Amino acid sequence: MHPVVLSCLGVLVSVLKTNGLKMCPHRCSCFDSSHFVDCKGRSLAHIPRDVPHGTWMLDFRLNNLSEIPATAFGGLWSMRIVLLACNRVQRIHPGAFGSLPFLEKLDLGGNRVGQLPADFSDGLQRLLELRLSDNRLEHLQRSSMTHLESLEKLDLSANRIVSMETGVFRGLYKLRHLLLQSNRLQVVEAGFFLMLQGLEALHLEDNNITAIQAEAFASLRSLSLLGLSGNRLGHINFKTFLSIQTQGTHLLLADNRWTCDCDLQRVFGKILSVRHLHVDDYGNISCSAPGQLSGYLLVAVDSQLCIAETATVLVITGTVLVTVIAAIVMAERNRKKNTNKSWNDSEGPFDSQEK
């Protein structure tokens, strides 16, 4: 071949590599130096099949993807980051991520996913961050999370989660941040957070929580932040928070439906006296009931909540004492009356003999 032709071919290959056009999917941009394929905002309905095999990062956000088939990432074993946020994904097929053994970050936020397949986590043993926020999930099953053993951050916020299977997060030994705010949970059960000894932040804000079981947080040995604001709590059990055995845990409890009475004052008094528990928003906690205290800050009335109860107890105690004393006096009078009567009756025969 003529030297000039060879030279031109060499230049062409060099240009193709430099501009990242070699084996690049149509309507996407490829950057060989960073192994990055950018398909963001291209109105694509399917994940391209010709994504280069050496790709580390795929940005497929802001497209029209409606489902993720099992073959979507076939052969892309070197992938580290997959961004699929803000699409229209309604269904994730079984085995969809099974060919991504080195994946570290998966973003599925802002889609329409209503259910995770049972094998969702198969092949995701090295995943560090999973974002599923702003979807339509209603129930979490344990099988979907089984293999996320390296996960450090899980974002499930802004879904429709009403229930979770007991032990759903049990295999997530390295989890540090769990975001469950803005869902529809009503009861925090004791089995939800088993084995999460490394969890540092648990966000449960803006749910419909009315009750928390006593041992719900007992296994969280590293918890530094517990967010419970914006729920429907009226009362809480001191044992629920006393079971949190950490170096220091900050609590967020404002914007609930607190019934401000002596019981609540005593519980918060105990919590505030525990050295490792810190209610960061205590000054913003307000009363919802009783009606005469609605809207008042708890800190403004907490010292008075037990006064009325104490006064009532004193009145009851005084009434009981008066009743008891009156009964004793009456009994004593009756005793003396009966004694005098018996004495008079016993003198009758002697008087008649003397006469």
Q: Can you describe what each PLM-predicted range is?
A:
Residues 32-88:
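LRR N-terminal entry segment and analogous cap-like coil->beta motifs
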Residues 3, 14-20, 24, 30-36, ...:
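Membrane-proximal C-terminal cap and juxtamembrane stalk of leucine-rich repeat ectodomains
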Residues 31, 45, 50-55, 66, 74-79, 89-90, 98-103, 113-114, ...:
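Leucine-rich repeat
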Residues 1-10:
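Classical eukaryotic N-terminal signal peptides for Sec-dependent ER targeting/secretion
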Residues 37, 56-60, 79-84, 103-108, ...:
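Conserved hydrophobic beta-strand positions in leucine-rich repeat
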Residues 44-49, 68-73, 93-95, 116-119, ...:
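The feature encodes a structural signal of leucine-rich repeats
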Residues 42, 63, 87, 108-111, ...:
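Consensus "Asn ladder" position of solenoid repeat domains
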